[in-house]
């Protein structure tokens, strides 16, 4: 299934249209929610507010990673300059990512998805797995083992956040430290500088769990992982609002549509899915309702 076989040229043009206003709103909303959550922890320190942040911040961290991903595709803003600068300095570096190496590795994922050459296969090809194996992965994520492993990999230059691609830049860690210095300074100006540790603790624990769930939701236990048809090798999760807020921000749950037309901005993906349904292109494609169903599918019976 190819875009020009299903959609008219006018429909494709409309879907591919980028909006700087929508892009900036997504970026600003993410950071406003981040600062608001950290302010709440500082204003009312306690177990409940810390737990609230531990649950809410991973979605904001993933939101930044998704926006980096969009910028890497050149589909977030209208201009390459904005995609490169905002994608790197405002979205990637705060989450210890690197736009350039990520985009390089992600291009290969799109090119080879549905084949043995997909570089991201190790993230999901083993599923379904036993319940005990899944719980072991969760323990590593939630106790910080996965996050600390990522930090070691970043320091050695062997990978970047959300990608196995070598970043190859001796300045990347320095840039990440610089951006986090600015982040700490901004928090300190509000009198809540110590909440940076809440951000980092969340990043190293619950965020790792959310990233794993995203990977499983997108490609694990699909109809046919080795078929080039995106309807078979990739999944969209039709999730309720609360799950999208906590686990799948910025329409990242519309992953099948993203693979179908990678240039469509994330804010246009729901419209793309609606059009595909109207045209019957998704007839017979299994509907996955929520990430609870994803987790059930990920466990071997």
Regions found by a protein language model. Name each.
Residues 67-86, 117-124:
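Aspartate-rich (DDxxD/NDxxD/DxxxD) Mg2+/diphosphate-binding motifs
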Residues 58-68, 100, 146-151, 199-228:
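Transmembrane alpha-helical segments that form the membrane-embedded catalytic/substrate-channel core
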Residues 37, 72, 76-77, 226, ...:
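Active-site-flanking alpha-helical
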Residues 1-57, 67, 92-197, 201, ...:
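Non-catalytic, topology-defining segments of multipass membrane proteins
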Residues 84, 88-89, 226-237:
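Membrane-cytosol interface motif
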Residues 64-73, 102-114, 214-221, 248-264:
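Histidine-centered catalytic micro-motifs
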Residues 232-251:
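Cytosolic juxtamembrane regulatory segments of multi-pass membrane proteins
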């Amino acid at each position: 299934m190819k875009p020009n076989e299903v959609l008219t040229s006018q429909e494709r043009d409309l879907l591919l249209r980028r909006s700087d206003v929508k892009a900036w709103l997504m970026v600003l909303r993410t950071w406003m929610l981040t600062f608001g959550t950290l302010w709440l922890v500082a204003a009312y320190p306690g177990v409940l507010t810390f737990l609230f942040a531990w649950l809410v911040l991973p979605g904001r961290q993933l939101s930044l990673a998704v926006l980096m991903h969009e910028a890497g595709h050149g589909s977030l803003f209208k201009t390459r300059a904005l995609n490169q600068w905002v994608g790197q300095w405002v979205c990637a570096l705060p989450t210890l990512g690197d736009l350039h190496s990520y985009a390089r590795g992600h291009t290969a994922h799109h090119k080879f998805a549905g084949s043995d050459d997909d570089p991201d296969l190790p993230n999901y090809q083993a599923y379904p797995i036993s319940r005990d194996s899944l719980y072991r992965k969760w323990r590593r994520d939630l106790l910080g083992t996965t996050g600390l492993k990522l930090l070691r990999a970043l320091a050695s230059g062997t990978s970047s956040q959300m990608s196995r691609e070598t970043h190859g830049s001796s300045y990347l860690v320095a840039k990440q430290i610089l951006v986090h210095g600015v982040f700490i300074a901004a928090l300190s100006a509000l009198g809540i500088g110590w909440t940076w540790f809440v951000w980092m603790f969340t990043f190293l624990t619950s965020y790792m769990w959310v990233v794993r769930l995203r990977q499983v939701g997108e490609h694990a236990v699909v109809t046919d992982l080795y078929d080039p048809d995106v309807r078979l090798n990739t999944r969209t999760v039709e999730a309720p609002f609360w799950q999208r807020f906590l686990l799948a921000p910025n329409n990242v749950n519309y992953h099948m549509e993203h693979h179908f037309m990678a240039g469509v901005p994330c804010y246009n993906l729901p419209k793309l899915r609606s059009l595909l349904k109207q045209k019957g292109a998704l007839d017979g494609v299994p509907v996955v309702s929520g990430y609870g169903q994803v987790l059930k599918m990920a466990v071997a019976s």
